[in-house]
């Protein structure tokens, strides 16, 4: 037997299981320096635990395939400060790939086949973002994911509205009275009328809808959105992968600043639409949203 590291006896493997060897080892080894406290780390108090829970938001992004879930995930990570440059689902050449599609099969096929979890801090809160598969072949993974989240972001293709898989996933959320935020995506392509999309969500999903933003133009004439909650003008940033400006704050929809920043016909249409929205749609009700009976609708 030789002297091992830190004063321990170096015992041959064949002899380690003999009773007399175990007694020698116990006598020779230095006294353990682990205290009860180091073996059992101090548990957080109920106050600190409740504060940590209150800071945390866990949500899933759901939709029919190819509506833009993963692209939206990249933008949320970008604006949340978790990444410096957003990736693309179907990257070409040196273009950066999406962070949530990390498996080889996902990168080859340009689809998500398993849920990915990403965490980032923003505005004093910790967000757990789950990007889920949209294809029906992998829907079991999405169904299980929806049992572990507090809320969901439902992504709609502006040209197609509510599609088959979107409806199935919504029904899973409905069973849990889960709060849902609706995001109407791809407004820079040929799209359906936004009022028609709102009506479809209201009629088919039996939800009260309240627009949180409103598009300025559609398709090739899409210029950006007006933030109805904070009275901000959000113009399209042509740089698709880096952090853009936070928008132009306005004093209201009649602010002359809008006339300076937008074409006359776009301003007139925006004011007309916003007036109609505020007449026809209910104001945002936080309790109704938390109960799963109202969905705020964002366009982008």
Please place each PLM-identified region on the residue numbering.
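P-loop NTPase catalytic nucleotide-binding module
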Residues: 44-67, 86, 157-300
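Residue-identity detector for glycine
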Residues: 2-7
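Generic short N-terminal amphipathic or hydrophobic helices
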Residues: 10-12, 23
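P-loop NTPase switch module centered on the Walker A-proximal segment
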Residues: 44-156, 162, 169, 196, ...
């Amino acid at each position: 037997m030789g002297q091992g590291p830190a004063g321990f006896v170096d015992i041959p493997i064949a002899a380690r299981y003999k009773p007399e060897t175990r007694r020698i080892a116990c006598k020779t080894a230095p006294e353990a320096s682990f205290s009860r406290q180091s073996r059992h780390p101090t548990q957080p108090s109920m106050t600190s635990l409740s504060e940590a829970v209150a800071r945390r938001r866990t949500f899933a992004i759901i939709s029919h395939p190819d509506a833009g879930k993963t692209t939206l995930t990249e933008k949320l990570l970008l604006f949340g400060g978790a990444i410096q440059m957003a990736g693309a689902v179907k990257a070409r050449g040196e273009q950066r790939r999406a962070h949530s599609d990390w498996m080889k099969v996902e990168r080859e096929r340009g689809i998500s086949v398993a849920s990915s979890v990403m965490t980032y801090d923003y505005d004093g809160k910790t967000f757990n973002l789950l990007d889920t598969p949209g294809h029906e072949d992998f829907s079991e993974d999405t169904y299980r994911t929806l049992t572990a989240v507090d809320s969901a972001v439902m992504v709609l293709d502006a040209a197609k509205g509510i599609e088959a898989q979107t409806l199935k996933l919504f029904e899973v959320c409905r069973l849990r009275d889960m709060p849902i935020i609706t995001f109407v995506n791809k407004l820079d392509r040929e799209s359906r009328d936004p009022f028609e999309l709102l009506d479809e969500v209201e009629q088919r999903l039996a939800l009260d809808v309240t627009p949180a933003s409103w598009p300025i133009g559609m398709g090739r004439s899409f210029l950006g959105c007006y933030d109805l909650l904070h009275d901000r003008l959000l113009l399209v940033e042509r740089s698709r992968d880096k952090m853009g400006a936070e928008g132009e704050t306005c004093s209201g929809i009649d602010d002359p600043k809008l006339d300076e920043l937008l074409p006359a016909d776009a301003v007139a249409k925006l004011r007309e639409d916003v007036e109609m929205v505020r007449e026809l749609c209910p104001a945002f009700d936080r309790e109704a949203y938390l109960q799963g009976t109202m969905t705020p609708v964002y366009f982008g």
